[in-house]
Regions:
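Short, flexible hinge/linker loops that cap or flank conserved catalytic cores
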Residues: 43-47, 155, 232-235
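Phosphate/Mg2+-binding loops and adjacent switch elements
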Residues: 87-211, 218-222
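Membrane-proximal helical "anchor" segments flanking the first transmembrane region
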Residues: 1-12, 54-61, 191
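Walker A (P-loop) phosphate-binding motif
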Residues: 38-100
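A transmembrane-helix-recognition feature enriched in membrane-embedded lipid enzymes
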Residues: 2-49
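Residue-level preference for the first positions of well-ordered beta-strands
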Residues: 50, 80-82, 143-146, 238
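Residues lining hydrophobic/aromatic ligand-binding pockets adjacent to catalytic sites
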Residues: 2-3, 11, 26, 82, ...
């Protein structure tokens, strides 16, 4: 309920409502703590290049599909990529390798999707550097690591930063909890590229910007991947009851 209300305030209101004005002190505190976290972080550099795919807003924007596509493109060009992720929604925080037969509650649904669709090694862990080190120890052939989410996880050194936005853009442009931003929009000037997932307007920065479009293929059960259903078959049908 609260999440839906905040989404409306962040992305549908052009001006700050009185309720959001009351949250301004929390936004200032969040900004201060975020800056301290970045300043105090001691980045761990892995022995292979690291590409971080993240975003500035809370919630999904298309990071996982882009990570999957990048893994496929790197493989096609002779690289041996591996993927690390936080694994949101899982029961633990430790480093866990993700296999095709892993359970979503153990590794997270998005890392499980990546493991099944990408065909590359995947490892989850709250500490991405530890997850990357474990992945490299188990798969020494890996020569590049993709980090699905983790733009704000400064404990992991990175060589390339890609930021994804969807059609909602940056919302009202304010920091959490007044707006949806984890970091200020000025951060866009320091990343390597901005990827717009059906983004309607561009940001006024010189950072290279590219467009992407997601197209549904088929659905399958996470607990039984053999059961599939094409997206076309579900056209016009209600899915929630």
């Amino acid at each position: 309920m609260l999440a839906r209300w905040l989404q409306r305030q962040w992305f549908e209101q052009r001006r700050l409502t009185p309720a959001l004005w009351l949250l301004l002190p929390l936004a200032w505190l969040y900004s201060l703590l975020s800056a301290l976290n970045r300043r105090l972080a001691k980045p761990v550099r892995l022995p292979v290049p690291v590409i971080v795919v993240g975003n500035l807003i809370v919630g999904g924007a298309g990071k996982t599909p882009l990570t999957l596509w990048l893994a496929q493109q790197l493989k096609a060009r002779g690289w041996n990529p591996g993927i690390v992720s936080r694994g949101y929604g899982r029961s633990g925080d430790g480093v866990v390798p993700v296999r095709a037969d892993s359970q979503p509650d153990e590794v997270g649904d998005e890392p499980l999707l990546l493991a099944r669709r990408s065909g590359v090694p995947v490892c989850v862990g709250r500490q991405r550097a530890a997850a990357g080190a474990a992945l490299l120890a188990a798969h020494p052939e890996v020569d590049v690591i993709l980090c699905d989410d983790g733009l704000q996880h400064y404990a992991l050194a990175r060589d390339v930063e890609l930021v994804v936005f969807d059609t909602r853009g940056a919302g009202n442009g304010w920091r959490l909890p007044v707006g949806p931003l984890r970091e200020p929009l000025s951060r866009l000037a320091t990343v390597d590229a901005i990827i717009g997932n059906n983004l309607k307007s561009r940001f006024s920065v010189s950072t290279p910007t590219f467009n992407m479009t997601l197209q549904p293929g088929s659905f399958y059960r996470l607990d039984d991947p053999q059961q599939t259903c094409s997206a076309e078959r579900l056209r016009g049908r209600g899915l929630l009851h």
